[in-house]
């Protein structure tokens, strides 16, 4: 496919094409352990020095897959600073998830899901969506993003469905490497846009 021809594809086919391309780019990037570790440190430094982090009562993070930026540094710092920390847990046989409070990264996590992602234990307390305070920050993974805040997920809608329930004024931050920031991502009615991007070049407000 010639450069630019993909933009003529119907939205669903374009998303599928972009997912395939982004997965290949991320696989190559994260195969370099030294590079990916440096990226994690750099991204963490940018975020932890931001006012958005300092003002956040709750940090909603994620447990990284092998082709995602590891946010362990951010999560440990949030706990050390006395902030509340939450990570997602998925429901079997559905595309739904909730967030759960965790008190330590040394907790017993489960990987009993189709993505082999670490999830909080059954003893973890679920976040009540209606009680999420303003200025909380959601650090959202994705395969690709654009500068208008569009996010390309893995196609199951976990984050879009959850974030559509959040009514408080929160920060929605897409976390990615700069090589998967693209010009055009089809944005459908149910897609939730990010307010910020975080990558190895900085923490960027998108002023949506």
Per-range role (PLM):
Residues 2-133:
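N-terminal active-site beta-alpha-beta segment that forms phosphate/nucleotide-binding
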Residues 2, 93-208:
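Conserved phosphate- and dinucleotide-binding cores of soluble alpha/beta proteins
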């Amino acid at each position: 496919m010639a450069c630019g021809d993909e933009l003529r594809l119907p939205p669903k086919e374009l998303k599928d094409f972009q997912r395939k391309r982004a997965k290949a780019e991320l696989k190559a990037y994260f195969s370099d352990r030294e590079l990916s570790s440096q990226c994690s440190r750099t991204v963490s430094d940018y975020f932890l020095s931001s006012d958005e982090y300092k003002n956040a009562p709750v940090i909603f993070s994620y447990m990284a897959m092998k082709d995602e930026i590891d946010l362990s540094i951010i999560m440990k710092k949030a706990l050390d600073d006395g902030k509340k920390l939450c990570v997602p847990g998925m429901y079997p046989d559905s595309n739904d998830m909730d967030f759960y409070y965790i008190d330590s990264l040394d907790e017993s996590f489960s990987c009993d899901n189709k993505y082999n992602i670490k999830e909080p234990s059954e003893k973890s307390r679920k976040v009540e969506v209606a009680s999420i305070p303003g200025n909380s920050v959601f650090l959202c993974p994705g395969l690709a993003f654009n500068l208008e805040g569009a996010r390309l997920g893995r196609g199951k809608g976990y984050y879009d469905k959850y974030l559509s329930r959040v009514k408080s004024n929160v920060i929605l931050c897409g976390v990615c490497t700069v090589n998967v920031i693209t010009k055009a991502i089809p944005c459908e009615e149910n897609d939730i846009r990010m307010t910020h991007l975080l990558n190895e070049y900085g923490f960027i407000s998108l002023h949506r």
